[in-house]
């Protein structure tokens, strides 16, 4: 659904219509789903449970009725209203975090007598009140002073309820009868210091001594510390987060220390292995307070308050699933607003106590009239708080988002990176030319880079060339390893990255772009999504419990199974094996047939599974455009190899050998089915009619054929979902091991042609050069089979004689090839279509065979072995001459090579365990955490070394052949990944708002038309963000960047500063480094350099900021105070750059902030 913004863009001037249309397409391509949710679907119900009076409903929004005119009692006279107004207008001095006028109802004036009249009046409670009360209170004992937060799911009618039960220590029934009003007054009078003539002192005493009288036992939590110093001791994670053992950060000086430490501590504080740690929240200090410090237990009445927020869901199941997904993934935000609602109710209780105390003592009014007046006031205030909650939640759920954030789209591995860079540079140029007034864009970017600090880890050096860093977005090896050893919630890490909460002291930042020009605001939002960074998250589903949990990027990962072999786009080459789970894996295709071998010596079918050997990135790219590959197929235990140690065959002097160190995708059976029931899988080659095997080979369970793949298939003509479709089917009668593939492939088949390079052409030419005399293989060195490939469409039952063994190279007869498939690669083949095929390995005296690797877009044909009418007598005779000792000797030789520790079942009668060394070890880069701001990696150089434990297998004595056989490759448990569409359960996309009709406090980035509401609620929002942080950790400061395109100003509002002179915040000091960054990038683009190069230059300049911050941190190490002029003379750092560099340095050197601020 397109937002009205895009419709308005069409009416703009023709000069910018082209670029605006491009921007419109950028946002609409991955458009965010705009659900519908009505505020009336949110219901609030409040209970109290008192020891003496039991449980009763204080408020139920579904049982209220609005009244137009209410006759106010004479007892609620104007004088009384003035008293109420006078009390409620009082504010605490110094700390704005507990401002009553903002938290209760900042939109109304308490001095206005008319507004004190109730607008709503309660009616009879709803029928489900008792049931909901039982659900909310549950079995929580009255003696428990803490708070409980629960989620309830009601099936009929479909509802979700979020409830919070906490202890109220006021000792009075504020909303009910006034029988305990005197108790509450006595309770307040216990503290003689709070009752002074100064009403502001009264309010301060109540809020400070009651609400925050007993903070949690954590150092530096005092509320009276200097919050204006810029360095709050409560912001130091190292001193606040309790850990049962020393933190690794004490000696961890690497550049990613802050990001690493933050995740490590999160793992410790959320792991049950280390005990249960209390969650951090300011309001918990009120609930967890100690009775010993307060008045005597005889006066304090234990009372529990329960707040329930009920979300009425739609009858549409899809809508319900969407909301459930959003609710549970964004639960920290819901909980934060729930706490804000709870605080409003608590503060209202305190205000009513004070007002009733003064009214009761001054006017001597009756209890009944006081009861009526307090009920009316409380009811209206709760309704106001509920309306604010409803509006916030509905806006959070329904407001438009930016369809394709620049950084996240680059992270997603999209093949259109060139186009994406081109679009980004177009928008960048437009903004530099149209938003340069008053240095608006440099000031805005300075503020963003200073506060949204998640960009810092993305530019940290990792030893890779800049082009690879830019194109592949490497991940942090240390953070990846941490995610496996100390798991944490990736959504929590992503949320912290978005808010920029990785520095020290910890700050939460958000950006609001204000302006009436929709197109300009939209462009600025799109531009900023490149600098406000976070990691991309991808939800994965595992077949079974495993240690590794691969998280890979959307749009680049597919899954396929052995039955259907469906393959989608991916950037990874992974192989996993798992048990047969019919509910997760597709059913077997009817087209897949398992032909039996008709060889006279082969008494049983042969089962083949797959092991894709690791190949380098360059080889995978080369293979995408290579028409011919040689595929080595072997049986269940090993590939047949005969070493060149003089053991020659007496009959024809040939020894069968296969290449062990070739960089090909090899077929290795895992022995999931019994050796008496082997089935040879079908492949794209027409081989002999009968399989050949002698008795010794049959005993050893080994056999091999040397096969080559037809070059006549054009890779671009085959869609990805057809690849491997019929290559390796499973037998329906056998409970065989299932194989899951994540095959490397590009997003679009057409891009395969573009990826072809000169290196690929040279590689093809080298492998297809005509054979020479030196390349001839002697009889005791090599044995090769000449095979004739028939047309793909030929029936699988057609007989074809197996060619005789020759000592020269094989040649292919392409007569039956498809002419269209051959046309693409005519230039790379000889006239007769022949190509040399070498099957030598790297044993002593042998030359390593250079075999091309095939990728997923190189399709297999349909058959590997077919029945024939003419038995392959030559091969059968040849195989009979091979002794079993040769295989054992060959494997002994191969044990000296580079290996992957994968043991393959041998299955021979001596139960001899054999080891296969398949060539090149993998370096598959897995962004295991993928939830750092460090990006994702698609290069083998970025992957870390993984320890691959051996999986032992015993062939002859294995009873349960249906047992799972694990090959512990990275990501082996991954079977399903979400679609390419933007996920609603992703903070990275859901909190980057578009042009909104109203201010949304939770959005990290958003655009609005006017700052009227922003001025109205910004102070309370920032205060709430500090008091109830969504990250569940102490926050020193909350800031908001306000960029006004109408006035061309950029200001930063802070929770530590009040608005002065009607200004929302403090003006931003433009950094000269940022200004130079923007202008140098613009000049490069104007000089017709490629957009990719310009974006790379932008990254280099950002990395320069990081290096300067490292230089600053090293200079400040060990110093107490330093002057700005000294930094300019010694380090060449200008005063305008110091705030930015200090913020960047705080991400890796926390002591910098303590020295400079």
From Swiss-Prot:
InterPro entries: DENN_FNIP1/2, FNIP_C_dom, FNIP_fam, FNIP_mid_dom, FNIP_N_dom. Keywords: Cytoplasm, Lysosome, Membrane. Residues 651-664, 904-916 have a biased composition (Basic and acidic residues). The keyword Glycoprotein does not apply. One of its GO terms (molecular function) is protein-folding chaperone binding. It holds the Pfam family FNIP_M. Residues 92-120, 616-665, 769-796, 904-955 are annotated as: Disordered. GO terms for biological process: negative regulation of lysosome organization; positive regulation of TOR signaling; positive regulation of TORC1 signaling. Its main location: membrane. Belongs to the FNIP family. This is Folliculin-interacting protein 1. It comes from Gallus gallus (Chicken).
